[in-house]
Regions:
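N-terminal glycine-rich FAD/FM-binding segment characteristic of electron-transfer flavoproteins
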Residues: 1-258
Length: 258
């Protein structure tokens, strides 16, 4: 069984998040960069299966800037056998469509029986990458699973719905996405951290994947301008000298708030 886990470097949830007003992209220097927690949970699903099924190979795949290699290597420290990182300046600011095309090509290069990813990243929260990657790969999908069972020929799981829960099954090869209902990821130990330095880590470009991300090659969204939200006004302070109630009522009526 060859399992590919899609992981992503994101700004630390507990740090500051800022936009670069010149580029409209996230300011990567504003906070510490970490491996997305939902991606770690997806990796835990794969590693737990590998622990119980010797011979299973787990590979982490990510599309990220060159300096993100150290973050992605955490996946190797956790237990993945290898990593593949797509690095290319042309991918800065890539939309969901481009991201899905590139990740699908990277997954094909790595080889797979099952692809696992988180349902929502903590920065973009698009929630569609799993389905889009599956479409590009031409394989079944099962998304937003709160429980997963991996078999030799199929993968099944539980998806929460407004009416309760639905049981879904997909024949392998397939793509699935998981929710935060799945267990927390394991912590890398010292042995794993040291071993990660010697594990295969392949860095590829768009040319290596034979993917063209020129806007003319496929429909995509491009940010043309971004501006900072203007600060709120200071408001009006009412001092109570016996007539504060009347002043407040007049203010609410004037601004159509009452």
């Amino acid at each position: 069984m060859k399992i590919v886990v899609l992981v992503k470097e994101v700004p630390d949830t507990y740090g500051d998040r800022k936009l670069n007003l010149e580029t409209g992209l996230a300011d990567r220097a504003a906070s510490e960069r970490v491996l997305d927690e939902i991606g770690e949970r997806a990796l835990e699903v794969a590693l737990s299966y590998a622990d119980a099924n010797p011979g299973t190979e787990v590979t982490v795949v990510s599309m990220a800037p060159e300096e993100s290699a150290a973050t992605i290597r955490k996946g190797l420290a956790m237990g993945a056998a290898s990593a593949l990182q797509v690095v290319d300046p042309a991918l800065a600011g890539a939309d969901l469509g481009v991201t899905a095309r590139v990740l699908a090509a990277a997954v094909q290069r790595a080889g797979f029986d099952l692809v696992i990813t988180g349902n929502l990243s903590t920065d973009g929260a698009g929630g569609v990458i799993a389905a889009m990657v599956a479409e590009h790969l031409g394989v079944p999908q099962a998304t937003a699973l709160s429980a997963v069972t991996i078999g030799e020929t199929e993968v099944s799981g539980t998806r929460a719905t407004d009416a309760g829960a639905a049981q879904v099954t997909a024949t392998l090869p397939a793509v699935i996405s998981i929710t935060e209902a799945l267990p927390d990821a394991r912590f890398p130990n010292f042995k794993g951290i040291m071993a990660a330095k010697k594990k295969p880590f392949e860095t590829v470009s768009l040319a290596d994947l034979d993917v063209d991300v020129d806007p003319a090659s496929a429909p995509q969204s491009i940010m043309t301008a971004v501006s900072e939200k203007p600060p709120r006004g200071a408001g009006i302070k009412i001092t109570d000298e016996g007539g504060a109630g009347e002043k407040l009522a007049a203010y609410l009526i004037e601004n159509r708030l009452a």
